[in-house]
């Protein structure tokens, strides 16, 4: 049995995505990329572009699980609100596509993938290249999304092992 997981690094201008398949306990890279919205467009138009492009990704890869970064409040409240809108568009489209949506904090993902919750984006990318046997990952946004997908696969495996251990 295999499971397709789509990781998403949401953004109001650039959204990264990473698709992996989990089969027989192994994580296989399927694809990764970015959805780039026209920065000159008004914000509502960018959200429409994001929805349309993300729907195409959902239709192409048909993931059972979509994993998205939890929102965090930085110094700029406007950026956090825009990120919230992008997350909403993605969650809506994921739900329409029949996928279950999971959320993880960035720090948890970094710790799960690299062993260090404060790892740099470049460190995460380097580990993923080795883990998934990739020569390059074109954009940091895409590697962040792949990290989300891989971390979810780790968490699912951990939960399955715990359930087996409890039933012994």
From Swiss-Prot:
The keyword Transport does not apply. Pfam families: RuvC (PF02075). GO terms for molecular function: crossover junction DNA endonuclease activity; DNA binding; magnesium ion binding. It is found in: Cytoplasm. Its EC number is 3.1.21.10. GO terms for cellular component: cytoplasm; Holliday junction resolvase complex. Binds 2 Mg(2+) ion per subunit. GO terms for biological process: DNA recombination; DNA repair. Mg(2+) 1 binds at residues 9, 141. It catalyses: Endonucleolytic cleavage at a junction such as a reciprocal single-stranded crossover between two homologous DNA duplexes (Holliday junction). Its main location: cytoplasm. Mg(2+) 2 binds at residue 69. The keyword Cell membrane does not apply. Its cofactor is Mg(2+). The RuvA-RuvB-RuvC complex processes Holliday junction (HJ) DNA during genetic recombination and DNA repair. Endonuclease that resolves HJ intermediates. Cleaves cruciform DNA by making single-stranded nicks across the HJ at symmetrical positions within the homologous arms, yielding a 5'-phosphate and a 3'-hydroxyl group; requires a central core of homology in the junction. The consensus cleavage sequence is 5'-(A/T)TT(C/G)-3'. Cleavage occurs on the 3'-side of the TT dinucleotide at the point of strand exchange. Belongs to the RuvC family. NCBIfam families: ruvC. Homodimer which binds Holliday junction (HJ) DNA. The HJ becomes 2-fold symmetrical on binding to RuvC with unstacked arms; it has a different conformation from HJ DNA in complex with RuvA. In the full resolvosome a probable DNA-RuvA(4)-RuvB(12)-RuvC(2) complex forms which resolves the HJ. This is Crossover junction endodeoxyribonuclease RuvC. It comes from Bdellovibrio bacteriovorus (strain ATCC 15356 / DSM 50701 / NCIMB 9529 / HD100).
